[in-house]
Amino acid sequence: MPSPLSLCRYLPRELSPSVDSRSCSIPLVAPRKAGKLFLGTTPPRAPGLPRRLAWFSIDWEQVCLMHRLGSGGFGSVYKATYHGVPVAIKQVNKCTKDLRASQRSFWAELNIARLRHDNIVRVVAASTRTPEDSNSLGTIIMEFGGNVTLHQVIYGATRSPEPLSCREQLSLGKCLKYSLDVVNGLLFLHSQSILHLDLKPANILISEQDVCKISDFGCSQKLQDLRCRQSPHHIGGTYTHQAPEILKGEIATPKADIYSFGITLWQMTTREVPYSGEPQYVQYAVVAYNLRPSLTGAVFTASLTRKTLQNIIQNCWEARALQRPGAELLQRDLKAFRGALG
């Protein structure tokens, strides 16, 4: 998640992105003064641990949970402080119905653990250490930058005491600004051979500096891992934003994220929901009948310039992945369109 502070300036060097895979037993979360929650203390690191593993840990005494921000199928996210710096902490649940899916989600979140980009949520640290008796596979500490997602801005459902005006917040110029933020993030991810595979407005955070950052990497995959698989592999995600080839169980490519971006851009410009109806019927129609959201609104047809926006979206959600633009070409097209608008 985006952060108004540069964590690098405030956190010790050993707290750079990390994974602590050691087993442990730490106290249950216990209430303390001022209504805050502390995770308690943990046993000291075993003597003789190699120096190269010095950053494979979370300093639990410095973790202060404040309140829950939200929850989903694979876990809960809390606002917290870490060494006094605002962060978000995600705890991945042990899903009793599908433990492997929970495990995949936890480790997938760490695909970006060592990456740095302005439009990507930064992982500060991670650990498989969990409080005793908790239903958690592990903990991930991420940078924090507020409570607002692109979904909330589009549909006007924020936690702010003064609701955002969608029309003020999402003018066409603002849509293009946010779109370029997201595409810049995708371009970086794809250059690192990482696919997000669940890109949608709810997984795009907007910082206090009005910068979009891609978050929630629980469905992400590394390209080399996908290429090594000899049989189709189920990929999680949101059916309304999944490319036809993903719905058919084919191997994912970076073009799957481009398809998801096309749906997201359509949502930004129309402020409508992509589909209605039962999921299985929508999925079938997307694959068999090339079903897509409507592009007949005035926002796409009012002028030749607006037709360009329609073409950009159509190119993103082409049925055949090879016909979709890559992130670099998409970035160029969006910049050209923004320039044409003046």
From Swiss-Prot:
Provide the catalytic activity annotation.
L-seryl-[protein] + ATP = O-phospho-L-seryl-[protein] + ADP + H(+); L-threonyl-[protein] + ATP = O-phospho-L-threonyl-[protein] + ADP + H(+)
Which molecular function GO terms apply here? ATP binding; protein serine kinase activity; protein serine/threonine kinase activity
- Active site: residue positions: D198 (proton acceptor)
Q: Where's the Protein kinase domain?
A: 63-338
Which keywords appear in this protein's UniProt record, sorted alphabetically? Answer: ATP-binding, Kinase, Nucleotide-binding, Oncogene, Serine/threonine-protein kinase, Transferase
Pfam families per UniProt = Pkinase
Query: Entry's InterPro entries?
Result: Kinase-like_dom_sf, Prot_kinase_dom, Protein_kinase_ATP_BS, Ser/Thr_kinase_AS, Ser/Thr_Kinases-Pseudokinases
Return the Gene3D superfamilies for the record: Phosphorylase Kinase, domain 1, Transferase(Phosphotransferase) domain 1
Q: What stretches pass through the bilayer?
A: none
EC assignment: the record states 2.7.11.1
**Positions bound to ATP:** L69, G70, S71, G72, G73, F74, G75, S76, V77, K90
Please state which protein family the record places this protein in: Belongs to the protein kinase superfamily. Ser/Thr protein kinase family.
* Database matches in PANTHER family: SERINE/THREONINE-PROTEIN KINASE TNNI3K-RELATED (PTHR44329), V-MOS MOLONEY MURINE SARCOMA VIRAL ONCO HOMOLOG (PTHR44329:SF285)
Q: What is this protein called?
A: Serine/threonine-protein kinase-transforming protein mos
